[in-house]
C-alpha cells in the first residue's frame, strides 16, 4: 500500500471519498510519522493525538453518511500563532506559558467546519519575529533538506518554519501559516513547498496572535500549487470579528489550476536585481521567464522605483506596531508571571523573563520610533514610503501587467546558528529584501519551488499579483510547477 503520508491533499481527498482507507488510518499514519521525526526536526511544539483521532472518526462518519466537507479527514498542522480552543497557543514564547484559549481563530474554525483534522501546533519564530525559526522558546526547527554530502543542520526559514518543515517532511498534509514580511513565502522557498500570502483582508485575522496588524495575513503552506489553492479556498472568508476582513466572495481557486496563460502580461522588476545576488538565483529567475513565455505569457520589464526604501521602512512600521500589540503581555491574567516588589516591578520582571532577545529588540525599536521626538522623523516618514511603494505597484498594474515574477530569497537555506547572521541582526533582516514590499502594499504573493541550487537545496520564485486576484497567481505558479517539477527531501531523520 502507498505510504499514506506521501499523498497530496487532492489525492487523499479522492481516496477518502472512494473509501480506499479511512480518515482514522490517514491520521494514524501522520501521527506515527511525527513520532518518528519530531525529535530530529522539532517541527511540532504540541501534539493533539486524541483530538485528532476523535476528529478523524467524526470525518469517517460524515464520509459514510455522504455529508463530507471539502477537507474531510485531511490532517493539518497549525502554526502556534492561531488560537485553538483548549489547546496550547503560545506564539512559541515563554511569556505565554500555559496559555490555552477559550475560543478558536476564524481561519482554523473554517478548516474544522470543512472536516479537516488537527494534528497539533507547529513551531515558529517567537511572536512570528524572525527569518530562521531560531528565536522560538522551544528551540530551532531543523530543515528536512540537507546539502549534498553534508550533515550540517539548516534552518527552514521563518517565521513559519515549523509549518514549512512539517509539510516538506510529510508530517502533515498541509499547514496554516502567517506572513508579515515574508514568513510564508521564505520558508516555503527554503523547503521546496508552496506558500501563498493572500491579499490583506482575504483571510480573517481574528484569533491570530498579532505582530504588526496592518501587515499580518494568514495563508497556507502546501506540497503543491493545487493543494495551496484547496486550502486557501477554505481558510478565506469574510468575518465580522475582523474589521479589516474584506466582504468579497471567495472564488474556487482550484479551478484556476491548468488555465492558459495566453494573453497574460508578466512584469520583471529591474530593482530586484540587487548587488551581490547569487548567480544561481539570477539564472533561475531567467529560467522562470522562459517557462512563462513558453506557456504563452508576454513578459515585460517594469520599474518599482521605491523598492530600495522598503526594508528600512518595514523595520520601522512593523516594530512600531509590535511594540503596541505586545504591550498587553504583562503577567497579570495569563502566561508567565514573575513576582516583584510591586505591580510595576512584576510587569518589568515578567516581560524581561518572558520575551526573547529578538522580540525585546523589536519592541525597543518600535517604542523608540513612536516616541515623541522621533515619531515624525521615523514612523511618519516610513508610512509615506509605504504609500509610495503601494503606488509603484498600482502604476505597473494600471499599465496592464497582470502579475510580477521575482526572486523570493537571496540564497538557499543557511546553517542553524550561522555566526555572521546571529551577530548582525541587519544581515538577518536582509533575508526579507524580496518579500516585504508585498506586505507593505497589501498584495498577494506566492512562492513556488523552481529548482535546486548547486548544493542540492531548493530555491523558489515569487509571483506577486493584483489585490484579490489570487487565481492569476495560482494558474501562473502551476505553469512554473509543470516546468520545474516537484521537490521532496531525501529522508535522513
Curated annotation (Swiss-Prot):
E.C. code: 6.3.5.7
Keyword ATP-binding appears in the UniProt entry: yes
Reaction(s) catalysed by this chain's protein: L-glutamyl-tRNA(Gln) + L-glutamine + ATP + H2O = L-glutaminyl-tRNA(Gln) + L-glutamate + ADP + phosphate + H(+)
Active site per database record: 79, 159, 183
Enzyme class: ligase
Biological processes per GO annotation: translation
Molecular function, one GO term: ATP binding
GO cellular component: glutamyl-tRNA(Gln) amidotransferase complex
Keywords noted in UniProt: ATP-binding, Ligase, Nucleotide-binding, Protein biosynthesis
HAMAP family with a match to the protein in the record: GatA
Record-stated family: Belongs to the amidase family. GatA subfamily.
Function: Allows the formation of correctly charged Gln-tRNA(Gln) through the transamidation of misacylated Glu-tRNA(Gln) in organisms which lack glutaminyl-tRNA synthetase. The reaction takes place in the presence of glutamine and ATP through an activated gamma-phospho-Glu-tRNA(Gln).
Protein name, UniProt field: Glutamyl-tRNA(Gln) amidotransferase subunit A
Organism this protein belongs to: Agrobacterium fabrum (strain C58 / ATCC 33970)
Amino acid at each position: 500500500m502507498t505510504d499514506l503520508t506521501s499523498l497530496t491533499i487532492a489525492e487523499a481527498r479522492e481516496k477518502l471519498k472512494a473509501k480506499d482507507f479511512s480518515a482514522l488510518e490517514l491520521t494514524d499514519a501522520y501521527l506515527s510519522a511525527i513520532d518518528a521525526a519530531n525529535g530530529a526536526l522539532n517541527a511540532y511544539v504540541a501534539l493533539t493525538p486524541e483530538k485528532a483521532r476523535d476528529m478523524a472518526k467524526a470525518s469517517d462518519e460524515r464520509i459514510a453518511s455522504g455529508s463530507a466537507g471539502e477537507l474531510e479527514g485531511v490532517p493539518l498542522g497549525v502554526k502556534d500563532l492561531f488560537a485553538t480552543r483548549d489547546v496550547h497557543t503560545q506564539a512559541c514564547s515563554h511569556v505565554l506559558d500555559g496559555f490555552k484559549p477559550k475560543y478558536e481563530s476564524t481561519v482554523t474554525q473554517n478548516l474544522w467546519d470543512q472536516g479537516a483534522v488537527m494534528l497539533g501546533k507547529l513551531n515558529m519564530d517567537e511572536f512570528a519575529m524572525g527569518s530562521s525559526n531560531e528565536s522560538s522558546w522551544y528551540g530551532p526547527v531543523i530543515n528536512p533538506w540537507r546539502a549534498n554530502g553534508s550533515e550540517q543542520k539548516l534552518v527552514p526559514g521563518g517565521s513559519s518554519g515549523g509549518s514549512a518543515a512539517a509539510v516538506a517532511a510529510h508530517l502533515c498534509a498541509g499547514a496554516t501559516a502567517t506572513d508579515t514580511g515574508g514568513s510564508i513565502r521564505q520558508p516555503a522557498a527554503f523547503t521546496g513547498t508552496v506558500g501563498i500570502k493572500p491579499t490583506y483582508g482575504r483571510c480573517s485575522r481574528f484569533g491570530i496572535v498579532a505582530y504588526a496588524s496592518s501587515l499580518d495575513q494568514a495563508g497556507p503552506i502546501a506540497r503543491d500549487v493545487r493543494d495551496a489553492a484547496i486550502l486557501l479556498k477554505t481558510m478565506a472568508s469574510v468575518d465580522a470579528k475582523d474589521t479589516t476582513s474584506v466582504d468579497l466572495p471567495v472564488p474556487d481557486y482550484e479551478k484556476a489550476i491548468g488555465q492558459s496563460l495566453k494573453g497574460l502580461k508578466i512584469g520583471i522588476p529591474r530593482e530586484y536585481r540587487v548587488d551581490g545576488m547569487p548567480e544561481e538565483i539570477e539564472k533561475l529567475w531567467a529560467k522562470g521567464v522562459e517557462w512563462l513565455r513558453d506557456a504563452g505569457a508576454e513578459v515585460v520589464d517594469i520599474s518599482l522605483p521605491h523598492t530600495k526604501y522598503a526594508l528600512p521602512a518595514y523595520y520601522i512600521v512593523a516594530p512600531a506596531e509590535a511594540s503596541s500589540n505586545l504591550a498587553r503581555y504583562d503577567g497579570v491574567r495569563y502566561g508567565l508571571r514573575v513576582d516583584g516588589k510591586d505591580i510595576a516591578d512584576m510587569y518589568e520582571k515578567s516581560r524581561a523573563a518572558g520575551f526573547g532577545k529578538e522580540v525585546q529588540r523589536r519592541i525597543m525599536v518600535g517604542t523608540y520610533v513612536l516616541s515623541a521626538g522621533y515619531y515624525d522623523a521615523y514612523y511618519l516618514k516610513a508610512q509615506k514610503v509605504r504609500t509610495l511603494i503601494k503606488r509603484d505597484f498600482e502604476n505597473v498594474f494600471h499599465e496592464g501587467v497582470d502579475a510580477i515574477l521575482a526572486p523570493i530569497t537571496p540564497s538557499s537555506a543557511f546553517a542553524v546558528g550561522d555566526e555572521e547572521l546571529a551577530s548582525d541582526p541587519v544581515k538577518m533582516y536582509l533575508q526579507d529584501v524580496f518579500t516585504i514590499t508585498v506586505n507593505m502594499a497589501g498584495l498577494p504573493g506566492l512562492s513556488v519551488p523552481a529548482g535546486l541550487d548547486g548544493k542540492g537545496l531548493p530555491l523558489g520564485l515569487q509571483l506577486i499579483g493584483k489585490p484579490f486576484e489570487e487565481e492569476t497567481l495560482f494558474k501562473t505558479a502551476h505553469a512554473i510547477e509543470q516546468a520545474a517539477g516537484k521537490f521532496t527531501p531525501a529522508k535522513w531523520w
